[in-house]
Every structure is written in structure tokens, then in C-alpha cells.
Swiss-Prot record:
It comes from the Eukaryota. The gene is PAL1. Catalyzes the non-oxidative deamination of L-phenylalanine to form trans-cinnamic acid and a free ammonium ion. Facilitates the commitment step in phenylpropanoid pathways that produce secondary metabolites such as lignins, coumarins and flavonoids. Contains an active site 4-methylidene-imidazol-5-one (MIO), which is formed autocatalytically by cyclization and dehydration of residues Ala-Ser-Gly. Its EC number is 4.3.1.24. Pathway: Phenylpropanoid metabolism; trans-cinnamate biosynthesis; trans-cinnamate from L-phenylalanine: step 1/1. GO terms for biological process: cinnamic acid biosynthetic process; L-phenylalanine catabolic process. Belongs to the PAL/histidase family. GO terms for cellular component: cytoplasm. There is a cross-link at residues 204-206 (5-imidazolinone (Ala-Gly)). This is Phenylalanine ammonia-lyase. The active site is at 99 (proton donor/acceptor). Induction: Induced when grown in presence of ammonium nitrate, L-phenylalanine, L-tryptophan and L-tyrosine.
């Protein structure tokens, strides 16, 4: 018996371990852990470079937020570097033939030299072949593209690459001196960023050319330029690397044997850009789930699409479960999304859509595979950041030199290809939800283009709808694989290569387009839920108006019970007709609504007995309601658009998506759109309201600059943990 109990305990422990592993494997947990880590670096925590524990959060912190970086103080780590260096020094002393130490490079490896230090200069010289602006002076002709952006890498990419290269070299497999790694860190600390060509790497023997500009900076090559100055968005200036090192009292490096190859022959740039891309992709994948939940509310959809039975029991793909669980939790407490599907008779829901359309109903199934692909990419790129990716590799313990191909960055390429395709699919889903939201034939009673005033002079969301089509089309183009375009290079020595940096660059572009698309959708979502709030207030008022007019004109003809029944029937007809007439201006819409009352009223007053006085009162009844409802609608529009109802009139209707809505409305100060239209453009354009694009740009910048990361992280931190 004791042994059986012991086995049962072990089984339970194994099960709990498995479940814990699954929980921590979700993209949400990866995002939250990474966000906490990044926040700690931004608050002063130091990044420790030890060759094994570098995270994407650390890469992002060093690359984008100038976080402090220090080399590991472990004696064992330093000893590993020194032992590998000693192997190379001994090989040189003995005159042993070692690739890149006594031989030429690539297809020219059949040449030999006994001048290893000169060989390092020859290596850098032939790799300094990228195209960069010759100066930052004003040009005599307007260029077709920004000269710097079109030819040089953003500083964040370069800083991230330097950190990753340090982390690779410190692993002790590259045969470089400890001082060389320290010098790279000196550049980071001084905020000296080499100006690196955007193009020229095929990421086969690593990112040779880009890394050569880092090496050129370390050696104070006067022809290699750097960005120097107090901050990335301050008075940065482009100066010679020699001048920058002198200004910061950093002594230039004279590269020892193999050290040129040690810097150049690695995947650091590909890994850096991929790391930064995946940090954003993870956030946008979570934000897409928030958008879908908010979209479910804006379209008055049902939470039933995210019910656990569908996803956990019936089709338990991990990504699908995660997406459904997150959206289910986000919608708890919502007064706009229906909590359950009520069973009704055939006649009760006749001519009504029985279920949400695919963009909402199948969103967990659509997003789930993207989540799984991004998770796989995160694992691959994290591993790459903690790998040795140059050639040859040195085993400091045995003295053996290994000639291999760890510089072949196909792991990064594959990660980026699947990430970029996932980005497109996320964008396609957001676009499909967005275009449904602005279409009055599909949006469950919202006005066309989400107009908050008469639609004859308000086409608010139409331009956004067109723009999002452009964005998703570009995403589709960018989703095409890069790796199918590999060309044989360098004397056919590099007959296969990875194009990882090109793929990573394309992924960053794709993420930027998705950010613009999602910013547009978020903007429309906030407008939509405000319109839902306005409509609810209108419904309450019209219901009271109908009750008052029924009592005033028909109390002599009907009993109290009959009046209640008539009132209820008329209100239902009002709601149905309002939903079907949203393309009309308010006056015409209310006339159409009350016209729909006539058949019902005639039937009531002729079905049992003819009531001439009641029949004669029908025109007045319709006129009174039409007039009063139109006036109420106008007052509500005025109060919402003026801000009289507060900045966030829809907050009380939302579930846990409320914080995103309030961030946009309050923190970013983006108001409900339509005041210019309501006043018939009395003050012209751009006076009462900024442009639609300016508002969307504010959301885009908040996502781009990381502010939205905090909002999304805080939102999900507050959600109950999944029990799987």
C-alpha cells in the first residue's frame, strides 16, 4: 500500500509539473515575464552577459532603452575565454594552419599567410563594402527616399547586435581576448553606435559586412562613422569612429589573430533584428486578442464563441485554447457581449443571424496557430542569442579547432518567415473585423462608417476602411518567403545561405504595417462602443417616450395590460427598424421608425372592435414620437460629442477591455469623432477636431514607443490565471 501511494503521489507531481510547464509555455506568460524583465532593466537593473542567459527582453532593453550592460564576473566564464584564446595563440606560434588565422576567407581559403595581424585588416577591408550616405549635408536635389533611413540601420538594431555578439564571444569558443569583448561593451556604455549599411548581408557566413563596421569602429578606422551624442533622439551627430573614441577616451583595438573573424563571423545582426521583431510580435498577438474581445463587444457578439467546451474539450490545440481563454476572460462583465445563447423558437429569431460571423466566431481557431508559430520563433531566436555562431570554433579544454558552419542563420530565417506569415494572418483577422464594424449591413445597428451625426454629411470611417485594405494587402505581399530567393554567392563557396537579416528586416516592416492597421482598428472600436452607449441612452429615452404617448393618446381605448403589451411591441419594432435604417439622417430615420408602427396600431384598434378615435390619433401618435425622438437623438449627439457625458461614456458597458478604451480616450486624449460634422463644419476643418489620421497616429506611436505594452501587460496581469 505505501508503495502504491508513493506512485500515486509521483503521478500527481508529474501531472502538476506538466500543467505548470504548459502554463508557462503560453504566449501570454512569455509576454508578461518578458515585460516584467524589461521593466526591471528600464528601472536600473544591469544586464549580465554570461553567454547562456541572454533574453529577448535584455536585448530590447540594451538596444532601445540604453540599459546598463556588464560582463559576467564569473572566473569560470573568463577562464573559458582565456583558454580558447591561448589555443589560437599557440597555433599561431606553432605555425599551424587554421582557417581565418593563416588562410584566406571563404572560396579563397586556399591562400596562406604568416601575417595573421595583417590578415585581420584584409578581412575588414573587403567587407567594408556597404552603401551609406557620404555626408549628412543638405542635398541639392530632393531624394526619392530619406538618405539615412534608406541605406543605414536604425541604432537599436546595431546596439542589439553588439550585445548579442558579446554574448556569443564570452562563451569561450571563438579564440578572442577578454579585452576585445570589454571594448564592445565600452561602445555600448558610451552610446557610440556604428553607422551600419542596411543591406549587403546574406547571413550565410554570418552577417559579415554589418559586423565589419563594428570591428572598424573598435579599431578607430577614420572612414568608419558612428552616431555619437547624448541620446537616440537628442543631438546625435555622425562623426568618424576615431574622433568618437578619442572624445570618450576609449583606446582603439589592434585586432589579434582571428579576432577580426571572431567579430565578423556571426549571426548577431540577424538575431538582434529578430529579437526586436519578436518582442513586438508577441505584444501585437496579445493586443489582437484584446481587439477581438473589444470587437465582440462593439458588434454585440456572443462570448459563446470562446466557450471552454469548444476549445479545451473538443479541439485542444494549445494556441487555440490560449486565445479563447484570454478572450473569454476579457469579456467577463461586459454588458455589450451576450453571455450565453438563449434557446428560442423558430419564429422568435426568424431572419436574424443565429451566430457571429467568422471573424469573431472562429478567431481562436485563426489566432491559435499564429500564437504557436510565434512561440516556436521565440524559442529559436532565444537559443540563437545564446549560441556560438562563428567559424572556426575553439575547444579550450582539448585544444581542438573545429571547422563548421554555425554561422548559417537558417534558424533565424525560419523563425522570421513564420513570424511574418503570422503577422499577416493577424492583420487579415483585424481587417475582417474592422470592415464588418463600419458596414451597416453587418454591424448590428451601428451607423455607416461609424458616423456620430447624420450620415449624409459624415463618412467618418470610410477612409480608414480603405486604408486598412491597403495595409492588409501590403502585409500579404510582405508575407511572401524571402528564403526562396537564395542565390549562390562568394565564388560558389556560399552556394546556400539563409538571408536571415533580409527576412528579419522584412518582418520589422511587416510589424510596422500591422501596428498601423491595429491602431486604425482600435480607433474605430472606441468610436463604435461610444455609439453603442449613445444608442442605449437613446433606447431608454425612446422607450419612455413611447410609453408616455401610448398612455396620453390611447388610455381611453385600452386597459393597462393592453397598453403595456402595445408599448412592448412598439418598442421592439422601434429597435428592429432603427437597426435597419442606420443609413438615414435622424429626421428621416425617426419618420421611418414611426411609419413602421402604423400596421401594428391599425391591427390593434381593428382586431376586436373598431375604435375610430384611436385610429384617428395614429398620425398624431407617430408625429409626436418622431419629433420627440429626433430631438432626443440630437441632444444626445450633442452631449456625447461635446464631452458632456465624460471622456469615456462607454466604460460601464465594457468588460475587462475597459482599460484599453480608457487609455485611448483619457491618456491619449482621443475624443469621440463627429463634432465638426454635427456643426456642419461651422469652423471649417481641423479646428474643432484633429484629423482622423492624427488620432490614429497617436495610437500608433503609443504602440511603437512601448506605452501600450504597459497597458496590455497590466490588463492581462489582472485576469484570473487559466486552469487549463
Amino acid at each position: 500500500m505505501p508503495s502504491e501511494l508513493f506512485d500515486l503521489d509521483n503521478a500527481r507531481a508529474a501531472r502538476d509539473t506538466f500543467l505548470d510547464a504548459r502554463r508557462t509555455a503560453t504566449l501570454l506568460h512569455k509576454f508578461l515575464d518578458s515585460h516584467r524583465e524589461l521593466k526591471s532593466y528600464k528601472n536600473g537593473r544591469t544586464i549580465n552577459v554570461d553567454g547562456h542567459t541572454l533574453s529577448l527582453a535584455a536585448v530590447t532593453a540594451a538596444a532601445r532603452y540604453n540599459a546598463n550592460v556588464e560582463l559576467s564576473q564569473s572566473a569560470q566564464v573568463k577562464e573559458g575565454v582565456e583558454k580558447s584564446r591561448a589555443v589560437i595563440a599557440e597555433k599561431v606560434e606553432q605555425g599551424t594552419s587554421v582557417y581565418g588565422v593563416s588562410t584566406g576567407f571563404g572560396g579563397s581559403a586556399d591562400t596562406r599567410t604568416d601575417q595573421p595581424l595583417k590578415l585581420q585588416q584584409a578581412l575588414l577591408q573587403h567587407q567594408h563594402a556597404g552603401v551609406l550616405p557620404s555626408s549628412s549635408k543638405t542635398l541639392g536635389v530632393l531624394p526619392l527616399m530619406d538618405p539615412m533611413a534608406a541605406t543605414s540601420m536604425p541604432e537599436a538594431w546595431v546596439r542589439g547586435a553588439m550585445l548579442i555578439r558579446m554574448n556569443s564571444l564570452i562563451r569561450g569558443h571563438s579564440g578572442v581576448r577578454w579585452e576585445l569583448i570589454e571594448k564592445i561593451n565600452d561602445l555600448l556604455r558610451a552610446n557610440i553606435t556604428p553607422v551600419v549599411p542596411l543591406r549587403s548581408s546574406i547571413s550565410a557566413s554570418g552577417d559579415l559586412s554589418p559586423l565589419s563596421y563594428v570591428a572598424g569602429t573598435l579599431t578607430a578606422n577614420p572612414s568608419i562613422r558612428v552616431f555619437d551624442g547624448p541620446s537616440a533622439f537628442g543631438a546625435r551627430k555622425m562623426v568618424s569612429s576615431r574622433d568618437a573614441l578619442a572624445a570618450h577616451k576609449i583606446k582603439p583595438v589592434t585586432l589579434a589573430s582571428k579576432e577580426g573573424l571572431g567579430i565578423l563571423n556571426g549571426t548577431a545582426f540577424s538575431a538582434a533584428v529578430a529579437s526586436l521583431a519578436l518582442t513586438e510580435a508577441t505584444h501585437l498577438a496579445l493586443l489582437a486578442q484584446v481587439c477581438t474581445a473589444l470587437g465582440t463587444e462593439a458588434l454585440c457578439g456572443t462570448t459563446g464563441s470562446y466557450a471552454p467546451f469548444i476549445h479545451v474539450t473538443a479541439r485542444p490545440h494549445p494556441g487555440q485554447i490560449e486565445a479563447a481563454n484570454n478572450m473569454w476572460n476579457l469579456l467577463q462583465g461586459s454588458k455589450l457581449a451576450s453571455g450565453h445563447e438563449e434557446e428560442v423558437s423558430i419564429n422568435q429569431d426568424k431572419y436574424e443571424l443565429r451566430q457571429d460571423r467568422y471573424p469573431l466566431r472562429t478567431s481562436p481557431q485563426f489566432l491559435g496557430p499564429q500564437i504557436e508559430d510565434i512561440l516556436a520563433a521565440l524559442a529559436s531566436v532565444t537559443q540563437e542569442c545564446n549560441s556560438t555562431t562563428d567559424n572556426p570554433l575553439v575547444d579550450g579544454n582539448t585544444g581542438e579547432v573545429h571547422h563548421g558552419g554555425n554561422f548559417q542563420a537558417m534558424a533565424i530565417s525560419n523563425a522570421m518567415e513564420k513570424t511574418r506569415l503570422a503577422v499577416h494572418h493577424i492583420g487579415k483577422l483585424m481587417f475582417s473585423q474592422s470592415t464588418e464594424l463600419v458596414n451597416p449591413a453587418m454591424n448590428h445597428g451601428l451607423p455607416p462608417s461609424l458616423a456620430a451625426s447624420d450620415p449624409s454629411l459624415n463618412y467618418h470611417g470610410k477612409g480608414v476602411d480603405i486604408a486598412t485594405a491597403a495595409y492588409v494587402s501590403e502585409l500579404g505581399y510582405l508575407a511572401n518567403p524571402v528564403t526562396t530567393h537564395i542565390q549562390s554567392a562568394e565564388m560558389h563557396n556560399q552556394a546556400v545561405n539563409s538571408l536571415a537579416l533580409i527576412s528579419a528586416r522584412a518582418t520589422v516592416t511587416s510589424l510596422d504595417v500591422l501596428t498601423i492597421l491595429m491602431s486604425s482598428y482600435l480607433y474605430l472600436l472606441c468610436q463604435a462602443v461610444d455609439l453603442r452607449a449613445l444608442r442605449r441612452d437613446l433606447d431608454v429615452g425612446v422607450r419612455a417616450i413611447i410609453a408616455e404617448e401610448v398612455s396620453k393618446l390611447f388610455s381611453n381605448n385600452l386597459s393597462s395590460e393592453e397598453m403595456d403589451l402595445l408599448h412592448s411591441s412598439l418598442y421592439s419594432k422601434y429597435q428592429h427598424t432603427m437597426d435597419k435604417t442606420t443609413t438615414m439622417d435622424a429626421v428621416d430615420q425617426m419618420k421611418e421608425v414611426t411609419a413602421s408602427f402604423a400596421p401594428m396600431l391599425v391591427e390593434v384598434f381593428t382586431s376586436t372592435r373598431v375604435m375610430p378615435d384611436a385610429l384617428s390619433a395614429i398620425p398624431r401618435f407617430r408625429s409626436n414620437i418622431s419629433s420627440r425622438a429626433t430631438q432626443l437623438f440630437d441632444r444626445l449627439r450633442a452631449s456625447y460629442l461635446s464631452g458632456e457625458r465624460g471622456a469615456t461614456p462607454a466604460s460601464s458597458l465594457l468588460g475587462r477591455t475597459r482599460s484599453v478604451y480608457e487609455f485611448i480616450r483619457v491618456s491619449l486624449g482621443i475624443r469621440m469623432h463627429g463634432s465638426e460634422n454635427y456643426s456642419a463644419f461651422a469652423n471649417g476643418l481641423g479646428v474643432d477636431d484633429p484629423t482622423i489620421g492624427q488620432n490614429i497616429s497617436s495610437i500608433y506611436e503609443a504602440i511603437r514607443d512601448g506605452k501600450f505594452h504597459d497597458v496590455v501587460a497590466d490588463l492581462f496581469e489582472a485576469l484570473p490565471r487559466s486552469k487549463l
